[in-house]
């Protein structure tokens, strides 16, 4: 035990200096508005504020190691500083003499202060002055560094989030709980600025108090509070306290201290004796082990030398010797705040013993240092941090001591919280180094990727900046030399030059001048500049007054039309009439033609031939499925990406006012919420309105009257009436077999031969094979399916030739290596093998095939040896196109049963078919059942026929008297075969009526007789359509007699070729009596009908 004069000697020693400028500048200053921000402090640790106060003095028989830190206006403030007033020692005389003796001892020249007793740590110990002379010191004497208590059994627990703390690295935490703030200030006021920092397991929890030990990680750090300052996070919010913590060592939490009492062993820590209760302070007390508890006592003993302290102060020493000893913890004064603060009993977490010279540890340390260097080379920020840490006082120890090196690696990494906590909790140095190495390796991979991305971005930016800088220099040079004007001036001049070559109407010229004047006064960076520029560009792209000279040579037009298309007499005659009028008048107005016909008959291709014959430009666009009116009328200029409609786009592309515009699939226009495109076509196709067509984008009248519009459609029923009224309809019927034969021989076969690469090979496609294709494979009215089959034949022939000759007959051409060819023509292109040379290790490169060969040399066509001959006949046709699709043309060829008749139908694909009608009866209640996927109209035709038969049952001989009920006890079932094909239309009326009569009179109908026509309820036969296709189907099926309505005779004479009508007798009837007499001619019932159901006149007949 030391006498009181020793403490008096300590009281005369100079106070510790403030932190050096380096420490104060290296520590990041927390922002009051950003609480608890995690940051690293690799610079030397600043001195603690609580050690700046005076040495300990006895206050009311209590020892205080420190006083609250002084407020320097920078690091913090102490609300209790004004209350801490030092009281004089009880024995003023002894205190004064002790001070004088201490001064005399300190002035002796042989007594030297030494800092060799200071304790080193992983970072400068808070409170050290780095050997600097304290203010007011009389000489170069150094101040000893304080010793951090090695044993501190009870601490105030501060929960932290996001990242754990590591020994030797600062962190600022923000506390918002008023009791915890009060506890921290009490710790500073009593000279015990030590807390324990533990990481919360749940990062979403924001609390300053630990209520359960399982809320935090079991391993934390023992920290010293270096400075505190208050901050206001917002208006109306409570005041917060930001404390800067400096961790010293790892600790392990044992238990929480409850509010009922203090838990622990009750021993006094190394920090010194602190007051307990008020009664014990007034009672007896004794200082225990003061030499090891109060910093600086050993140094005082050194300075006193051999001076006998006991002899100089015998009374005081004797007085204190009798004080009673009472041991308490360092933070007993915080127990009154429980449970509003969390006090924990902790123990130091010791590192397992290890050999520093272990080969494994040294190898891992070397690898860590290497990774540090690699990251420092890639990331300048990381390099600055490591450099800043390297200038600290103890930086040389970090790379020599494994535990500190592992902690440094964990601090600088951005790993997960669990990985960082694992490094902190590890007690094995080797395991800790291994975990730190994994974290640092991940940082290296991230740094490499970041470096690569940064390098790529820099390269692009530098290239653009260089180009921009050179372009600006070039503009300046050209401007000085007068070689080129400003870009906007050049643009304006270009527009003026374009407009000068166009015959703009007066109104359009005025709009152009206004927009051009606006463009001149706009800055190129303005958003409206591009809008105005695009508008003027479209105005100058419209071919105002520019037209193509038309060719009205009739013979030339006939030659062009016949070369491209076979048949289509009506369409060709209409075009020739159009040209004849133009030749007489010298000019023609635009017309609107509508070509209606089944698919594949050449409606679209005939439009191209018409344009070619007239010498006009051709433009095609389809409106099938179109729902947006803006596609026709254009968009408003206010929209981004706005543009004119299709008519204006067509004029821009063809650059003439009189092109031929083909509007395809006009019968398939859709409707939507944003308008009806069919109605928008009215203005464009109306000859009275399209002279001043108004586009939404241009908003100036456009003359479309010189445009020849040709529309195509499959049916007329879906075209709106007002639109159909503005068009001249030309029906394009299907091709008959003879026409298909000519088209295949003259057009399809030569085209397919060239497409297959067999133009120089002797390939013979016999007419019999083509006829078999048409009869058994391609019965459609068009030739599109026929073209597909002919293409297939030539493809099979090409494959057969190559297979038969083999590789020896057709060798591959010898070419140099493809990669060398590319390198010779494009030296900047690198081989694929070099594309992965700069790839970062550990990454995958996709899309790079090192074996891919590329070339720019075109491949020469191969020569087929002469003498190769392929012949396609009707017999071997199935080897090329497979088995036939159609086998029988008629279901009944010989003696059909009663109740069967033969009708003619028009299929949806534009072809005709022979369709038998079958009727049977059974006992029932007089119901009529219809099957065969029949439509509504054909069902009505069956009901009409049934009603006519019932009303004329006596005349037909079905009943014996007119009053006899007919078929009330019989059910009738009507069926039309091929139920998978839908059937609709009124043209089966005569065939159904004939089948009813055949069933009820039990008389068969000749199978070589077919019929078509609609019947009325009173027995009249009405005309129907599709006669050409129906007659073609009858001709193909071998029908010898056709019963057709008399109203269809002009259509048959005009549109049906003689080749189709050959061998068929046509009977033109007007009522059902003529139909029945002709269908049952020569039978017994027909002879009886001559009296009961006579014909008014004989039907007209024609035999071909």
Swiss-Prot record:
Positions of the Lon N-terminal domain: 155-444
EC top class, as a word: hydrolase
Keywords: ATP-binding, DNA-binding, Hydrolase, Mitochondrion, Nucleotide-binding, Protease, Serine protease, Transit peptide
Stated name of the protein: Lon protease homolog, mitochondrial
One Pfam family here: Lon_lid
Domain of life: Eukaryota
An individual GO BP term: protein quality control for misfolded or incompletely synthesized proteins
Source species: Cryptococcus neoformans var. neoformans serotype D (strain B-3501A) (Filobasidiella neoformans)
Catalytic residues (positions): 987, 1030
GO MF terms, alphabetically ordered: ATP binding; ATP hydrolysis activity; ATP-dependent peptidase activity; sequence-specific DNA binding; serine-type endopeptidase activity; single-stranded DNA binding
């Amino acid at each position: 035990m030391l006498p009181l004069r020793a403490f008096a000697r300590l009281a005369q020693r100079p106070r510790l200096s403030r932190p050096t400028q380096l420490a104060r500048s290296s520590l990041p200053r927390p922002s009051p508005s950003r609480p608890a921000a995690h940051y690293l402090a690799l610079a030397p640790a600043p001195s603690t504020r609580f050690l700046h106060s005076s040495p300990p003095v006895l206050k009311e028989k209590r020892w205080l190691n420190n006083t609250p830190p002084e407020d320097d206006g920078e690091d913090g403030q102490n609300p209790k500083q004004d209350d801490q007033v030092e009281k004089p020692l009880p024995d003023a005389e002894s205190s004064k003499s002790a001070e004088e003796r201490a001064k005399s001892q300190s002035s002796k020249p042989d007594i030297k202060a030494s800092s060799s007793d200071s304790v080193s740590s992983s970072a400068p110990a808070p409170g050290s002055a780095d050997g600097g002379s304290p203010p007011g010191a009389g000489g170069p004497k150094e101040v000893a560094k304080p010793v951090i208590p090695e044993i501190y059994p009870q601490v105030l627990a501060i929960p932290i989030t996001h990242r754990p703390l590591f020994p030797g690295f600062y962190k600022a935490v923000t506390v918002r709980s008023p009791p915890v703030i009060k506890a921290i200030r009490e710790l500073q006021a009593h000279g015990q600025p030590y807390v324990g920092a533990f990481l919360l397991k749940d990062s979403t929890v924001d609390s300053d108090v630990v209520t359960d030990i399982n809320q935090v990680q079991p391993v934390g750090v023992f920290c010293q509070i270096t400075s505190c300052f208050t901050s206001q996070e917002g208006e109306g919010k409570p005041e917060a306290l930001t404390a800067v913590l400096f961790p010293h060592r790892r600790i392990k939490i044992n238990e929480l201290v409850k509010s009922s009492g203090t838990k622990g062993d009750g021993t006094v820590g190394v920090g010194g004796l602190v007051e307990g209760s008020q009664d014990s302070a007034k009672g007896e007390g004794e200082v225990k082990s003061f030499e090891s508890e109060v910093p600086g006592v050993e140094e005082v003993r050194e300075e006193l030398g051999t001076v006998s302290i006991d002899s100089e102060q015998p009374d005081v020493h004797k007085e204190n010797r009798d004080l009673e000893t009472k041991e308490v913890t360092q933070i007993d004064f915080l127990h009154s705040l429980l449970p509003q603060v969390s006090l924990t009993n902790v123990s130091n977490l010791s590192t397992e013993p290890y050999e520093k010279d272990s080969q494994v540890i040294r190898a891992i340390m070397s690898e860590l240092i290497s990774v540090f260097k690699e990251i420092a080379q890639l990331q300048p920020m990381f390099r600055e941090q490591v450099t800043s840490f390297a200038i600290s006082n103890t930086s040389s120890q970090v790379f020599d001591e494994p535990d500190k090196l592992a902690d440094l690696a964990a601090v600088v990494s951005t790993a997960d919280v669990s990985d960082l906590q694992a490094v902190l909790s590890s007690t094995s140095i080797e395991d800790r180094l291994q975990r730190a190495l994994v974290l640092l390796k991940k940082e290296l991979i991230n740094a490499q990727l970041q470096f690569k991305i940064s390098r790529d971005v820099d390269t692009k930016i530098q290239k653009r900046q260089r180009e921009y800088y050179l372009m600006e220099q070039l503009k300046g040079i050209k401007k000085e030399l007068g070689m080129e004007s400003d870009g906007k001036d050049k643009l304006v001049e270009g527009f003026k030059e374009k407009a000068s070559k166009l015959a703009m109407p007066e109104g359009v010229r005025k709009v152009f001048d206004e927009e051009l004047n606006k463009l001149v006064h706009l800055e190129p960076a303005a958003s409206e500049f591009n809008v105005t520029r695009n508008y003027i560009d479209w105005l100058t792209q419209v071919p105002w007054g520019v037209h193509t000279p038309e060719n009205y040579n009739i013979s030339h037009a006939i030659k062009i039309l016949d070369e491209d298309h076979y048949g289509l007499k009506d369409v060709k005659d209409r075009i020739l009439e159009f040209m004849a009028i133009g030749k007489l008048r010298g000019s023609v107005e635009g017309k609107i033609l509508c070509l209606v016909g089944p698919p594949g008959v050449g409606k679209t291709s005939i439009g191209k031939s018409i344009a070619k014959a007239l010498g006009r430009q051709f433009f095609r666009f389809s409106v099938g499925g179109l729902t947006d009116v803006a596609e026709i009328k254009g968009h408003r200029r206010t929209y981004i990406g706005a543009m004119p409609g299709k008519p204006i786009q067509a004029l821009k592309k063809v650059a003439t006012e009189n092109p031929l515009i083909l509007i395809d699939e006009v019968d398939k226009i859709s409707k939507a919420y944003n308008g009806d495109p069919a109605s928008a076509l009215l203005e464009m196709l109306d000859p009275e309105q399209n002279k001043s067509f108004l586009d939404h984008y241009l908003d100036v009248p456009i003359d479309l009257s010189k445009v020849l519009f040709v529309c195509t459609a499959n049916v007329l029923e879906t075209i709106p009436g007002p639109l159909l009224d503005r068009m001249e309809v030309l029906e394009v019927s299907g091709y008959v077999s003879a026409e298909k034969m000519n088209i295949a021989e003259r057009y399809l076969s030569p085209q397919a031969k060239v497409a297959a690469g067999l133009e120089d090979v002797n390939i013979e496609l016999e007419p019999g094979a083509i006829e078999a294709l048409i009869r058994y494979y391609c019965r459609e009215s068009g030739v599109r399916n026929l073209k597909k089959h002919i293409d297939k034949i030539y493809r099979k022939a090409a494959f057969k030739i190559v297979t038969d000759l083999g590789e020896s007959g057709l060798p591959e051409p010898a070419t140099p290596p493809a990669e060398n060819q590319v390198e010779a023509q494009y030296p900047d292109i690198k081989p694929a093998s070099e594309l992965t040379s700069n790839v970062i290790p550990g990454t995958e490169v996709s899309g790079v095939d090192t074996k891919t060969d590329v070339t720019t040399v075109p491949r020469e066509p191969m020569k087929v040896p002469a003498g190769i001959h392929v012949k396609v006949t009707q017999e071997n046709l199935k080897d090329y196109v497979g088995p036939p699709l159609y086998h029988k043309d008629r279901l009944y060829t010989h003696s059909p049963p009663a109740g069967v008749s033969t009708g003619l139908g028009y299929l949806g694909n534009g072809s005709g078919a022979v369709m038998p009608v079958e009727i049977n009866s059974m006992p029932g209640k007089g119901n009529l059942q219809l099957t065969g996927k029949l439509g509504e109209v054909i069902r009505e035709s069956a009901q009409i026929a049934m009603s006519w038969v019932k009303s004329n049952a006596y005349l037909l001989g079905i009943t014996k008297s007119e009053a006899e009920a007919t078929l009330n006890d019989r059910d009738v079932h009507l069926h039309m075969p091929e139920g998978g094909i839908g059937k609709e239309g009124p043209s089966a009326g005569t065939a159904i009526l004939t089948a009813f009569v055949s069933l009820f009179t039990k008389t068969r109908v000749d199978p070589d007789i077919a019929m078509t026509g609609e019947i009325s309820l009173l027995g009249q036969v009405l005309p129907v359509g599709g006669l050409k296709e129906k007659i073609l189907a009858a001709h193909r099926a071998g029908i010898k007699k056709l019963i057709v309505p008399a109203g269809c005779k002009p259509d048959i004479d005009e549109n049906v070729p003689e080749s189709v009508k050959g061998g068929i007798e046509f009977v033109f009837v007007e009522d059902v009596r003529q139909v029945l007499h002709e269908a049952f001619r020569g039978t017994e019932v027909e002879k009886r009908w001559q009296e009961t159901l006579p014909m008014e006149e004989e039907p007209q007949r024609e035999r071909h």
